[in-house]
Amino acid sequence: MISAISSPWLTQLSHFCDVAAFTANSLSSLNASGGYHLSPSPGDPYSQHEPHYEPCSASQHSYSFGHACPEPESGASSSSCASSTPGSGSTGSSGSSKAPVKKNPKVANITVQLEMKALWDEFNQLGTEMIVTKAGRRMFPTFQVKIFGMDPMADYMLLMDFVPVDDKRYRYAFHSSSWLVAGKADPATPGRVHYHPDSPAKGAQWMKQIVSFDKLKLTNNLLDDNGHIILNSMHRYQPRFHVVYVDPRKDSEKYAEENFKTFVFEETRFTAVTAYQNHRITQLKIASNPFAKGFRDCDPEDWPRNHRPGSLPLMNAFARSRNPVSSPPQNGSDKDGDGRREYERDTSGTPLHGDAAHQQLMSRVLSPSLPVPGGLVPLSTGRPSPPHELRLDPHSQGSEPLHHHPYKYPTSYDHYLGAKTRPAPYPLPSIRGHGYHHHPMNPAAANMYSGAGAPGSYEYGPR
């Protein structure tokens, strides 16, 4: 794992903080005794079948389960919780547990706030599912946090790991839309820790922005050699977030237990699946994921208010910040309304996907009542091309036939260059295009590929 960190701090890191000692000593000593008790949250779809989660044996899973996150006090923020601080009021510890370790002042005052908590809560009410694939799949919602209380001049590393919630394997009952216990858990997967790629960094850098683990991927490949987190499908997991102080002392291994602090957010626990089981999870992921627009019937902002998920205003702002070509907000102005449909119309004003037969076909293909297969949420880092968004324009009253313009879709690179779509269509298959060069100021070149057909002769040599 250390080799994955390409940073000039790598040489000093070997003296500052022994990462292997952290994973072997700190995490194992996090809760050497006691179980990982998690009381079901309100509306938890698992609670009706499982009144509580009993700890599984550490010998079976090779995990040392952490204590549960204590319930926040009255008036306290429920979005920030430090679960690893001994003596913080957590339950489930036995009388033989180790004495509380006094945390280093560099980490003692650190607090963490979970971003997009409303969205996480909405998924948690339904029973969050995360796709795992052999190649690795990113999480959605992405685990993002805001950190407070760090020493601005000290160096910190940020890590994540995943621990089983219990020792059970689950199956989804479609007739009752609920999860049922299917038996004992499968053999434990190799435990791995994901390091944030910016680690280590100064506390000032971590605190000035939202920390996102968008590079983290989940896999079910036991032989994975890409550093992804390995999980068993149909098992429940709890993500844990760790803040590690890079101790400059040469004997920092002795202080491993006091140089880190762990945070657990119960609303982020999930079931690992290879395909979404709950259709409501599928619909919510499509509605709230900015990279899943291709699977929507229409723009979420055009949905009726009573059918719109409560987290969409938050996710629409997130989508606009991550995707510059997404729809701008509706503020009642005609200019914004025209901008929202900029990519759905060509220069002549013809609405794309406006044909009635096409709308009927799309409505059948994209009907929310049809079962949607898993893996629909492409979390690529690139921006999606607007022409490929299967979006129906509810404002279009009709459409004119394309006639001899069968290629009236704007080019993908025009959007990245900020240019308007070309008035001329793509060359027809009968026209040879190997000598084509774009001359925006040359009428002959512009008319060469017009709908009227190519000229009788064209000089391909230099002029």
Curated annotation (Swiss-Prot):
<keyword id="KW-0804">Transcription</keyword>
<feature type="DNA-binding region" description="T-box">
    <location>
        <begin position="119"/>
        <end position="297"/>
    </location>
</feature>
<dbReference type="InterPro" id="IPR036960">
    <property type="entry name" value="T-box_sf"/>
</dbReference>
<comment type="function">
    <text>Probable transcriptional regulator involved in developmental processes. Binds to the palindromic T site 5'-TTCACACCTAGGTGTGAA-3' DNA sequence. Induces pre-placodal ectoderm (PPE) gene expression in regions where RIPPLY3 is absent. Plays a role in the formation of the anteroposterior (AP) axis during embryonic development; required to establish the posterolateral border of the pre-placodal ectoderm (PPE) acting downstream of the retinoic acid receptor (RAR) signaling.</text>
</comment>
<dbReference type="GO" id="GO:0003700">
    <property type="term" value="F:DNA-binding transcription factor activity"/>
</dbReference>
<dbReference type="InterPro" id="IPR018186">
    <property type="entry name" value="TF_T-box_CS"/>
</dbReference>
<feature type="compositionally biased region" description="Basic and acidic residues">
    <location>
        <begin position="333"/>
        <end position="347"/>
    </location>
</feature>
<dbReference type="GO" id="GO:0060788">
    <property type="term" value="P:ectodermal placode formation"/>
</dbReference>
<keyword id="KW-0217">Developmental protein</keyword>
<keyword id="KW-0539">Nucleus</keyword>
<keyword id="KW-0805">Transcription regulation</keyword>
<dbReference type="GO" id="GO:0000978">
    <property type="term" value="F:RNA polymerase II cis-regulatory region sequence-specific DNA binding"/>
</dbReference>
<feature type="compositionally biased region" description="Low complexity">
    <location>
        <begin position="75"/>
        <end position="97"/>
    </location>
</feature>
<keyword id="KW-0238">DNA-binding</keyword>
<feature type="region of interest" description="Disordered">
    <location>
        <begin position="320"/>
        <end position="354"/>
    </location>
</feature>
<dbReference type="InterPro" id="IPR046360">
    <property type="entry name" value="T-box_DNA-bd"/>
</dbReference>
<dbReference type="Pfam" id="PF00907">
    <property type="entry name" value="T-box"/>
</dbReference>
<dbReference type="GO" id="GO:0005634">
    <property type="term" value="C:nucleus"/>
</dbReference>
<dbReference type="GO" id="GO:0071300">
    <property type="term" value="P:cellular response to retinoic acid"/>
</dbReference>
<dbReference type="GO" id="GO:0050793">
    <property type="term" value="P:regulation of developmental process"/>
</dbReference>
<feature type="region of interest" description="Disordered">
    <location>
        <begin position="39"/>
        <end position="58"/>
    </location>
</feature>
<feature type="compositionally biased region" description="Polar residues">
    <location>
        <begin position="323"/>
        <end position="332"/>
    </location>
</feature>
<feature type="region of interest" description="Disordered">
    <location>
        <begin position="367"/>
        <end position="405"/>
    </location>
</feature>
<dbReference type="GO" id="GO:0045944">
    <property type="term" value="P:positive regulation of transcription by RNA polymerase II"/>
</dbReference>
<feature type="region of interest" description="Disordered">
    <location>
        <begin position="75"/>
        <end position="103"/>
    </location>
</feature>
<feature type="short sequence motif" description="Nuclear localization signal">
    <location>
        <begin position="420"/>
        <end position="431"/>
    </location>
</feature>
<dbReference type="InterPro" id="IPR008967">
    <property type="entry name" value="p53-like_TF_DNA-bd_sf"/>
</dbReference>
<dbReference type="InterPro" id="IPR001699">
    <property type="entry name" value="TF_T-box"/>
</dbReference>
<protein>
    <recommendedName>
        <fullName>T-box transcription factor TBX1</fullName>
    </recommendedName>
</protein>
<comment type="subunit">
    <text>Binds DNA as a dimer. Interacts with dscr6/ripply3.</text>
</comment>
<feature type="compositionally biased region" description="Low complexity">
    <location>
        <begin position="367"/>
        <end position="380"/>
    </location>
</feature>
